[in-house]
Design a protein with these regions (language model features):
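N-terminal positively charged helical leader segments and presequences
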Residues: 1-99
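Structured adenosyl-cofactor binding patch, chiefly the S-adenosyl-L-methionine
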Residues: 28, 33, 128-129, 150-156, ...
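Short, ordered loop/turn segments at secondary-structure junctions
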Residues: 46-47, 66-69, 139-142, 188, ...
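Short basic, glycine-rich beta-strand/loop surfaces that mediate nucleic-acid
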Residues: 76-87, 153-157, 161-163, 199-207
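RNA substrate-binding interface of SAM-dependent RNA methyltransferases
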Residues: 101-190
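Short glycine/serine/threonine-rich phosphate/pyrophosphate-binding segments
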Residues: 118-122, 213, 238
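Active-site/ligand-binding-proximal alpha/beta "capping" segment
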Residues: 183-233, 237
């Protein structure tokens, strides 16, 4: 039975007008995602050629020049001539999402207090590249779905389940019950990540570059590991650390 405490909170992702997803890769992924409701597309002739009329399907669309697309978006947004006005994706439940995946070699990323959408988006992009089953965040102090997050993820926001929960510690408890070995990635971890020789399902916990993984969250991990780096550098950017760790776990 599903734990009611982990039920996704009733918190809207976006304003009533919807959010704007922009850029060729994010737009293609959104158009291909059956869970994504798209209200309209605004794009240039060149972007239409890149995306293809077939992928647009029956989505209401308008052909404009690049400046018209820019006016719909935050200043400086790199849109490559396309913007989609969308609804936020329906909320996902962690246990239900994992029930639809085959156990044995799954990886779930758990992000603790990583609030920068560029970092979170880059982590999603790596998650897609390495076949991660889900990325889990807390419903506070984590990026909500947005055009910036989608752009940084380069399409992965619409391909990797991005799940927010009320409490990360309880989510880690649930992952433990489901058979996941929970690893905190931290500079003071007990051994290099490569030395763990871990088989089976893994939940990898990443913390913010400033404060790291919170104490209570770390206490819900089975072990802590680190990525060896040159002593002249204190740490890696968290999105770079995620990519290195995922490569190591999949190697």
């Amino acid at each position: 039975m599903r734990d009611a405490r982990n039920k996704p909170p009733h918190r809207p992702h976006v304003a009533a007008a919807g959010l704007w997803i922009y850029g060729l890769h994010p737009a293609r992924a959104a158009l291909a995602n059956k869970r994504r409701r798209i209200m309209r597309a605004v794009l240039t002739t060149r972007a239409l050629e890149e995306i293809g009329a077939g992928l647009l399907g029956r989505v209401k669309h308008q052909i404009v020049d690049g400046e018209a697309v820019s006016r719909l978006l935050p200043q400086g947004a790199v849109h490559q001539g396309v913007a989609l006005q969308c609804e936020g994706l329906p909320r996902r439940d962690l246990e239900e999402t994992l029930a639809a995946t085959a156990p044995g070699a799954r990886i779930v990323l758990v992000l603790d207090q990583i609030s920068d959408p560029h970092n979170a988006g880059a982590i999603l992009r790596s998650a897609a590249a390495f076949g991660v089953a889900a990325v889990v965040v807390q419903d506070r102090n984590a990026p909500s779905e947005s055009g910036v997050l989608a752009k940084a993820a380069s399409g992965a926001l619409d391909t990797v389940p991005y799940i927010d929960v009320v409490n990360l510690s309880r989510a880690l408890e649930k992952l433990g019950e489901l058979g996941f070995w929970r690893i905190a990635l931290a500079g003071d971890g007990g051994q290099p990540l490569a030395d763990g020789k871990i088989k089976g399902d893994i939940a990898l916990v990443l913390g913010s570059e400033g404060s790291g993984i919170r104490r209570l969250v770390r206490e819900h991990c089975d072990t802590a590991a680190f990525i060896p780096i040159d002593s002249r550098m204190e740490s890696l950017n968290v999105s770079n650390a995620a990519a290195v760790a995922l490569y190591e776990l999949r190697r």
